[in-house]
């Protein structure tokens, strides 16, 4: 492949890629425009529905003064409109008012049917116990010594006590005043609806125009020094430098000391050397001392018959024998010599 062919192929590929990119950009722009148009139509439809709902709510009488008195009393989000003055609270505190202490006697001019309750002292009791204290019980300890002991463990749960006595009937209430006439009038102010939940996040908008160039910023802080790098490779050896000037003779050094070291520990034995040549035959050793006599051995086998010994000297003449009788034939000479040698061996 030549250089011209490679260049032509790269140009054709780049052109095709550029055309595909332009087509994709146009398609994306068209899709984004369609989405914007759909969103605008949905928003317009939502606004029209909201206006219709508001008209219906106004026709139904929502937000009028007669329907918002109660909410105003509890501190709602507030509606503006013509409202009649709120009814004054009664002397004992009514709807939305604080509760004052009950009077000692009924006010003058308030009908009670002539049946005023009779309590000790001619008025209302101050509390559940007239004496202002707790329920009557036994003698109570008035000690002032502080008990620093830790509390003991909780005891077992006691038995259920008897039911208490029924309380006294309460004082009859006063008759309420007649309410004033209320007329439904259309609202004269804006109706503020509560803020609804957040909707889903919309698509990213188109990039806006480039803003004006801002002022030049302050110079940044100087950067920190970087970490030391890895050591580089050794360079080639440099050329030898010129010889320096001879230095001045140094001062006389101190006398040297030759320490005498102690002999070190004995080293391990070395390996065996090669076998040397055979030496000359040594002299015969002196005969050693005779060892102790051993135990007698077992009787050996009979040896071969030895040679006949020399004939001995003639013996002395014997004594006269007995009368002649029949005698056996004399034995052979060989048998007599063998028996004699055997007799000598046993003696040894």
From Swiss-Prot:
- Per the record, a Pfam family? Col_cuticle_N
Q: Where is this region: Disordered?
A: 76-348
How is expression of this protein distributed across tissues?
Localizes in stripes along the alae.
Ranges where the record places region Triple-helical region:
152-178, 196-258, 261-284, 288-323
| Repeat is among the record's keywords | yes
Q: Which InterPro entries match?
A: Col_cuticle_N, Collagen
* Biological process, per Gene Ontology: cuticle development involved in collagen and cuticulin-based cuticle molting cycle
Give the record's GO CC terms.
collagen trimer; cuticular extracellular matrix
Which SMART domains does its entry note? Col_cuticle_N (SM01088)
Q: Which UniProt keywords apply?
A: Collagen, Cuticle, Disulfide bond, Repeat
Q: Where is the composition biased (Basic and acidic residues)?
A: 322-338
- Composition bias (Low complexity) maps to 194-231
Which stretches does UniProt call biased (Basic residues)? 339-348
User: Which intervals carry biased composition (Gly residues)?
Assistant: 120-137, 297-306
Effect of changing residue 71 to C: reported as:
In su1006; body is twisted into a right-handed helix (roller phenotype). Roller phenotype is sensitive to changes in diet leading to metabolic disruption, such as reduction in vitamin B12 intake
* Gene Ontology molecular functions: structural constituent of collagen and cuticulin-based cuticle
Assembly behavior: Collagen polypeptide chains are complexed within the cuticle by disulfide bonds and other types of covalent cross-links.
Question: What exactly does this protein do?
Answer: Nematode cuticles are composed largely of collagen-like proteins. The cuticle functions both as an exoskeleton and as a barrier to protect the worm from its environment. May play a role in cuticle remodeling in response to the environment. Involved in body morphogenesis.
Q: Which PANTHER family does the protein's record reference?
A: COLLAGEN, CUTICLE COLLAGEN ROL-6
Record's family? Answer: Belongs to the cuticular collagen family.
**What protein name is recorded for this chain?**
Cuticle collagen rol-6
The species is Caenorhabditis elegans
Q: What is the lineage of its organism?
A: Eukaryota, Metazoa, Ecdysozoa, Nematoda, Chromadorea
């Amino acid at each position: 492949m030549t250089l011209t062919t490679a260049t032509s192929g790269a140009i054709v590929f780049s052109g095709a890629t550029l055309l595909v990119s332009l087509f994709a950009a146009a398609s994306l722009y068209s899709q984004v425009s369609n989405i914007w148009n759909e969103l605008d139509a949905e928003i317009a439809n939502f606004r029209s529905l909201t206006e219709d709902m508001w008209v219906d709510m106004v026709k139904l009488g929502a937000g009028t003064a007669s329907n918002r008195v109660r909410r105003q009393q509890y501190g709602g989000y507030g509606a503006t409109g013509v409202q009649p003055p709120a009814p004054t609270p009664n002397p004992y505190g009514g709807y939305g008012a604080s509760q004052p202490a009950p009077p000692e006697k009924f006010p003058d001019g308030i009908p009670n049917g002539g049946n005023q309750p009779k309590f000790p002292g001619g008025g209302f009791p101050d509390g559940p116990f007239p004496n202002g204290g707790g329920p009557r019980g036994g003698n109570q300890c008035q000690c002032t010594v502080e008990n620093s002991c830790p509390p003991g463990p909780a005891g077992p749960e006691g038995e259920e006590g008897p039911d208490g006595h029924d309380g006294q009937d309460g004082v009859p209430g006063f008759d309420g005043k007649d309410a004033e006439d209320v007329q439904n009038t259309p609202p004269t102010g804006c109706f503020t609806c509560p803020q609804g939940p957040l909707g889903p996040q919309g698509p990213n908008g188109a990039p806006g125009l480039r803003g004006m160039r801002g002022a030049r910023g302050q110079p940044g802080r100087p950067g920190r020094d970087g970490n030391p790098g890895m050591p580089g490779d050794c360079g080639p050896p440099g050329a030898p430098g010129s010889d320096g000037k001879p230095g001045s003779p140094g001062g006389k050094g101190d006398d040297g000391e030759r320490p005498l070291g102690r002999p070190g520990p004995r080293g391990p034995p070395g390996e065996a050397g090669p076998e040397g040549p055979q030496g000359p035959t040594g002299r015969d050793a002196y005969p050693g001392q005779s060892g102790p006599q051993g135990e007698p051995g077992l009787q050996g086998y009979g040896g071969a018959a030895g040679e006949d010994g020399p004939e001995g000297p003639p013996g002395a003449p014997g004594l006269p024998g007995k009368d002649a009788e029949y005698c056996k034939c004399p034995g052979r000479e060989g048998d007599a010599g063998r028996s004699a040698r055997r007799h000598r061996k046993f003696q040894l």
